[in-house]
Design a protein with these regions (language model features):
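Short, well-ordered beta-strand elements
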Residues: 43-58, 75-80, 155-159, 259
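An extracytoplasmic/periplasmic, membrane-proximal ligand-sensing/linker region
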Residues: 45-48, 58, 174-184, 188-205, ...
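Short helix-initiation/N-cap motifs at beta->coil->alpha
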Residues: 54-57, 78-90, 186-197
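A bilobed periplasmic-binding-protein/Venus flytrap-type ligand-binding module shared by bacterial periplasmic
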Residues: 130-140, 238-253
Length: 308
């Protein structure tokens, strides 16, 4: 009996210790953490996988912002960079949960046509988006229809971004043939390379024409202007949408509601883009930079998860 009594006391003590440990751990967990089951107390899965388009700075800004916001709420958020086509394929298959940079109705139409039935559109967060051909303010032309006659002044080159980008297809399939620019070389590589070329040309006060888009921090950083597009080859103004996997509202009922209410004007976006992309910081420094920016824009950040 004594041995059994001792065992009982040890069992009670062990259970008490386990309970105390659980309470102690829960006190240390981020708000919303539920436990090891992989879910939060708001009904959402704990882990979210965000895909980020290579070279799209507004996507980088929005993705790091939401990573910060969600991790403050107890989520684990993984960001993965990808070219556009495999990003949509990954969303359709459920390998990724969400992307914050789908331009509609034009730029990413082909991907929505292909995968739209396997995706969920959580709505637009910026309605001031547009594709542009931009030149330095000192350039002597103001419209794309003047570019052919002045092509030699621009080295017979249009400097583009990633080959798989939606804007690249628009320029190649619409702008170049409509304005008779087939005699110019359309150079594609990456957004950082395009921006480096733009910066170097302006430093030398040389003419250069680049593919660009609004909103983008380059408009604050460089003396540039958009060329008028009288033929409308670049398309009308667009909206930036948050597109997610089909099951997003089942897997993340709370976060998907926050994201469907997400809104960010261009000035606020420029501010975060400048802090991240135009600061010369390493990617590893982006979380800390975003946290600092968030503390300086706390009312806005808090509004992203407020009940509306």
């Amino acid at each position: 009996m004594k041995r059994n009594h001792t065992r009982t006391k040890r069992t009670v003590a062990a259970l008490a210790l386990a309970a105390a440990t659980a309470v102690g751990l829960s006190a240390c967990m981020p708000p919303g953490y539920y436990g090891a089951s992989g879910t939060l107390d708001n009904g959402d899965q704990k882990s979210m996988h965000v895909v980020v388009f290579n070279g799209w700075d507004e996507d980088t800004a929005a993705s790091y912002l939401w990573k910060h916001v969600l991790e403050e709420k107890g989520y684990d958020v993984q960001l993965t960079n990808s070219d556009v086509a495999p990003a949509y394929s990954g969303l359709a298959s459920g390998d990724y949960d969400v992307v914050f940079d789908t331009w509609l109705p034009n730029t990413h139409k082909q991907y929505m046509d292909t995968y739209g039935k396997q995706l969920t559109d959580l709505g637009s967060w910026n309605e001031q988006a547009s594709l542009e051909l931009a030149v330095p303010e000192y350039s002597g032309i103001d419209s794309i229809d003047e570019l052919k006659a002045h092509a030699s002044e621009f080295g017979n080159k249009i400097i583009g971004i990633e080959p798989a980008a939606g804007e690249t297809k628009v320029v190649s399939d619409q702008v170049i043939p409509q304005y008779g620019l087939d005699g110019m070389d359309f150079i594609t590589s990456s957004t950082p390379a395009m921006l480096a070329d733009l910066k170097a040309s302006i430093a030398k006060k040389e003419d250069v024409v680049v593919t660009l888009w609004r909103p983008h921090w380059a408009y604050d950083a460089f003396p540039i202007k958009d060329l008028k597009d009288p033929k409308g080859a670049l398309g009308k103004n667009e909206e930036i949408h948050t597109i997610a996997k089909k099951s997003i509202e089942d897997d993340f009922p709370t976060a998907s509601k926050w994201m469907s209410d997400f809104s960010m004007d261009s000035d606020t976006l420029y501010s975060l883009e400048n802090a991240l992309v135009n600061s010369g910081a390493k990617t590893s420094e982006y979380p800390a930079i975003t946290a600092k920016w968030a503390s300086e824009h706390q009312d806005y950040v808090d509004s992203l998860t407020s009940t509306k």
